[in-house]
Amino acid sequence: MKENAILATNTSSIKLENLRVDLKKPTHFIGLHFFNPVSQLPLVEIIKCMDTDNDTIHSAFSFVTKIKKLPLCCLSSPGFVVNRILSPYMTEAMILHKENVALKSIDNAAVNFGMPVGPVELVDNVGLDIAHSVSGILGEAFNKEESFSLEPMIKNKKLGRKTGEGFYKWEKNRPVKPKPTADQKKNIPEDITDRLILPMVNEAVACLYEKIVDDSDLLDAGVIFGTGFAPFRGGPIQYARNRGINTTIEALESLEKKYGPRFKPHKGWDNFK
């Protein structure tokens, strides 16, 4: 590499500090995380470390804007912003599936909230192998136990859309969603939407508390443009504000009492009171 060359990675979840240990100029190393499908999602996360060279950051911003993408600068941390916020959304979907809630019902709850696709279809789109890898990185980093293992499906080559079958079978690049059984029709939790959405909101608060991103408006924009999060709701933080901060916290506390500590409100909520 040339003396002043910049090296960039498209990693979706690994801390940059773990990837740059053998570089002669680690301060010239940066993350440029694009989102799939690249042609449809305009966001690029620009990942920096505490000591990343300012010229490197400016060059990354210049590159991203020149290719007509939207840059979101965030601090190196497992999952960065978007994947960290998405992870509990997909995890809760797997837990609901384990409780024999129909896959279609899970996806419908999210779509009715305003998400572009449901979490089950999203896992199939991302690829079960990739989702499993990201989940493992985040679980190790944040001491979260794996509540649903994708390994059996991965071993059977059911990786999602790219192999023709994951949670759904895929025909002509579209998922075939089976109708819920009679028992599953009776088994749709009243709080299914909150169980899917509020963990994302809680994780967004954690990202702000840890200063992974500078402010809530940037975070909301990043989540909307990186995931398609119900745009009319303004992003996860704006959704909480519109719903009411105290009301949102109370809803999380209620879910925590019913389902366990994964719903425990993050201490960062204190900054919103």
Q: What do these predicted ranges mean?
A:
Residues 1-273:
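N-terminal glycine-rich phosphate-binding loop for ADP-containing cofactors
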